[in-house]
Amino acid sequence: VLTCYPGLHALFLHRRAHACWNAGFKWLGRFISHLSRWMTGIEIHPGAKIAPGVFIDHGMGVVIGETAEVGEGTTIYQGVTLGGTSLAKGAKRHPTLGRNVVVGAGAQVLGGFTVGDNAKVGSNAVVTKPVPSGATAVGNPARIIAAEVDAKREEAASKMGFSAYGVTQNDDPLSQAMRGLIDNAAG
């Protein structure tokens, strides 16, 4: 893990780049960030604030913008963008992720809003509005699926050793089948 894990390397190098950035050595922070991107395929702006315990899994293509904040215990999968929707300097342009958030592969979280603690963002979702704590956002454009149904489903799924963050309320046959199986198991 220490020698061959790009997510770990990117976070280690980001901490150095962030320290340089905050100390006023902007060029050095950007340079370390650039080297990190070249080595890992993960682009984290040196101004981004990333708490301890963040996990970037299969991180190729992850982009985290300058004013983004990522809370403790958050998991980010491949191809995720925490991006901005404005070029305004001095403004909060990138999202804030609370604690223990899961962001699925390919998701785009765009803008200066908050994704609450324990929220989930489904794979390939495009989120442009706040996500409440404990909720799940899925789709393009993202919509919030019922938190109480999601909580019951997640509890049943965890008893089976399965993470159901990608199970949606969509009417497509595969989603209906997955919901039915997990809801049936929940009893």
Predicted feature descriptions by range:
Residues K89:
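Glycine-rich phosphate/ribose-binding loops and adjacent secondary-structure elements
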Residues T85, A105-G111, D150-A151, V167-D171:
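Short C-terminal domain-edge/linker segments immediately following a structured domain
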